[in-house]
Every structure is written in structure tokens, then in C-alpha cells.
A protein has these predicted regions:
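Active-site- or DNA-interface-adjacent structural scaffold in DNA-acting proteins
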Residues: 111-163
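DNA-recognition alpha helix
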Residues: 94-110, 151
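Helix-turn-helix DNA-binding elements, focusing on the entry/boundary residues of the two helices
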Residues: 91
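Non-catalytic DNA-binding core/recognition domains of DNA-processing enzymes
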Residues: 70, 76, 98-99, 121, ...
Length: 163
């Protein structure tokens, strides 16, 4: 069974909640990553999305568990999939970002402050393809509906506060 997120990362792993973004960047990637950071930090949103992911992905991967590989965590799969869809990127670009972009790696929960090449978790292209393929269009649409509902609730709260 895949884990939601690695519960006890090493001492040098940068926490997702403290990831900093460039404030004046107009690229789409930081906006997507900020959204993912919000999903990770909001308990209610996090729980509902991971419940859905766990149900869909863990059921599909039963056959590969026999191979002895633990596979990526649900959070890593979600981040890779959202970035691929949101940037309309091919697998080669996602492979590059997952292994080289420090902010994306920090949101994935795998970036270390030590920056030693030996310590850095790396993903193979085939690993990314196999894991991202586990999220089908229906699951992504359901996740989208959950996130949009969350956004609507935030707007209602904001209107009540200022209205």
C-alpha cells in the first residue's frame, strides 16, 4: 500500500510548509506549486484528496507490489501529475523538473538543504511515466471538483469577513 507522504523525512529535508516562491515570477509553475502547497497544508482539503487518491491508486498497484518495489508516495504522484497537466508538459520536462527544480522538489517533500548529489532522490523517466499514468482523467476531474469547492468556500468566508 502506498503511503500518503513520508512521515519522517530526514533532518535536512525542507518542509513543504516553508517553501518560498519568487514573488514576481509570471510562469505557471509557481502558481501550480502554491496551489499544491495549499492542498498539503489544509487538513480538510488534504484528507479528502488523499482519500480519493488512496482508493484509486492503491487498488491499481496491487499487481506491482509483488515486484518488491514500494513505489512513489501518493503526494509525489499528485505533484508530478498536476505539473504535467498544468504545464501541458511532456514526460521529459517533468523528469527534468522532478530531478532539478528545487522549488518543485521542495513541494514534493524530497529537497534537502544539504544539496549533496549523493543524498538527492532521483527519478527515472520510466518511473515517472508509470506512476503518473495511475491517475486517470476521472480522478483528476474529481480532485479538481474538490479544489474548486474549497476555493468557493474561501471566497464565501472572505465575503462574510469584508461584506
Amino acid at each position: 500500500m502506498r503511503q500518503k507522504f513520508e512521515k519522517s523525512p530526514d533532518l535536512f529535508t525542507i518542509p513543504i510548509s516553508v517553501t518560498k516562491f519568487h514573488s514576481n515570477c509570471r510562469d505557471e509553475a509557481p502558481k501550480l506549486l502554491k496551489g499544491l502547497q495549499t492542498i498539503f497544508m489544509d487538513e480538510e482539503l488534504n484528507e479528502s484528496i488523499f482519500l480519493l487518491l488512496s482508493d484509486r491508486i492503491n487498488n491499481k498497484r496491487a499487481a506491482l507490489i509483488k515486484s518488491g518495489r514500494t513505489g512513489m508516495g501518493l503526494w509525489e504522484i499528485l505533484v508530478l501529475c498536476v505539473m504535467r497537466q498544468g504545464l501541458n508538459a511532456n514526460y521529459d520536462r517533468i523528469h527534468y523538473l522532478a530531478n532539478s527544480d528545487t522549488i518543485m522538489r521542495s513541494i514534493m517533500g524530497i529537497e534537502s538543504e544539504s544539496n549533496l548529489a549523493v543524498d538527492r532522490k532521483q527519478y527515472g523517466l520510466t518511473t515517472i511515466k508509470d506512476n503518473v499514468a495511475l491517475l486517470d482523467e476521472q480522478t483528476l476531474n474529481e480532485i479538481n471538483a474538490i479544489v474548486v469547492g474549497y476555493g468557493h468556500r474561501l471566497l464565501k468566508k472572505k465575503k462574510k469577513r469584508f461584506g
